[in-house]
């Protein structure tokens, strides 16, 4: 097939990119192109925030390579639209024969959401809803004769919504179909696909024959990660990955009666690679799970992680058996639909720390935790296996930096003084004592060397965590948290400057930043933005502000 015939299959229209799109930021580079955050000009004069992937354009393109580049667009065109799949809005070519894929923009990906959790586990209801949307997307792909082949947290995109019930606060969509291909094809299968931590045993052992069950294995790894906020098999390399799999799933050639953990082909495939599988017995995965994981899902994970791909359940079976819906929910669509947002949001993403973009690794992470299971963690989670939360666990070593996923949020600056933007919530949230005035003061910890007094506690942080719960902080949280009741107390207080009830001489080296927001209808308007090297000045400015005259000092305590 020639390049011209490949392009004709897509029926590409020619568009001058600059005439329709305004690039805001480069999000990252991928194997086949670069992803940008952009705004698309609509006929009604409004702008829509989108993710635009510009495919690489080689000087001497070969038809096979061009077809691989366009695989994502071809797959999304053949698979009908679904609320749990990223929406391909447009595919076009510019006069220079550059091809662009335009997709909806999401707030973040699942990996970034894990990091932002800071070790706080999802509730059962929220985890259930996230997993239901993921398995619904996988089921839809398989139903249309495709396999994704790269299911991982970075390719699961997240948008924060505010429906009721509150457990459905996230809209989840599968993205990055660059490795997707038909389940049945005359072309030979690529052996090296999927990301190592989520790679099925048949892929690790370089089997030339595999099917859609590789997606179910990856889903099993993600189920574990959703409940524990930690990866199950964080291997450093291929050999280490196989060893870690054997530590948990056991040697697949020991017990022929163990359907889940026996696979006769594994030994021969490993021998061909010069690898000897360790003679280990299966470790109960249920003991590695925290208590927020329901019994049904704890039983589902070993089935999904079966050595033998033929005994893994299908996506359809998983959805029907392990994700039963109550009668009231079954009458309506439990999967969040696309949220229409004609108004362009100013806050195109939420801030993430620079740690979110690093890709360092800790050697022997899971193995170390396994050895500490009995001695150090059993007292905390009697029925689970403890380890550090996901926030201290990094991405796979083979995961590229900003690999062109559709949702790479705009990072916040890491300088001492930050001028916060409307909608950004940092570590402290403070409210006016006057309930008739709806204000929000956001601020950051400004003194790395400063320790709060022993009798002072940042009550606002605790109240915010309890109220916001699993949501990604955004301007919408203001409408939910503004009614937190605070009582006056004479002894314990939080001042406007975070964690600093008594500023003194030791504070002079610190830098404080704050933003005062005023509610006006459904919008939050910036009333005051201020940065100063003297935290006491921030407090004075806020106290002297006309709208804060009733709050000379905020005396807050727990509700």
Swiss-Prot record:
SMART domains: S_TKc
Catalytic activity: L-seryl-[protein] + ATP = O-phospho-L-seryl-[protein] + ADP + H(+); L-threonyl-[protein] + ATP = O-phospho-L-threonyl-[protein] + ADP + H(+)
Entry similarity comment: Belongs to the protein kinase superfamily. Ser/Thr protein kinase family.
PANTHER family assigned to the protein according to its UniProt record, in alphabetical order: MITOGEN-ACTIVATED PROTEIN KINASE (PTHR24055)
Protein kinase domain segment(s): 21-323
GO cellular component: cytoplasm; nucleus
Protein name: Sporulation protein kinase mde3
Organism: Schizosaccharomyces pombe (strain 972 / ATCC 24843)
Any GO MF annotation of the entry: protein serine kinase activity
Keywords assigned by UniProt, alphabetized: ATP-binding, Kinase, Nucleotide-binding, Serine/threonine-protein kinase, Transferase
Active site as annotated: 150 (proton acceptor)
EC number of the protein: 2.7.11.1
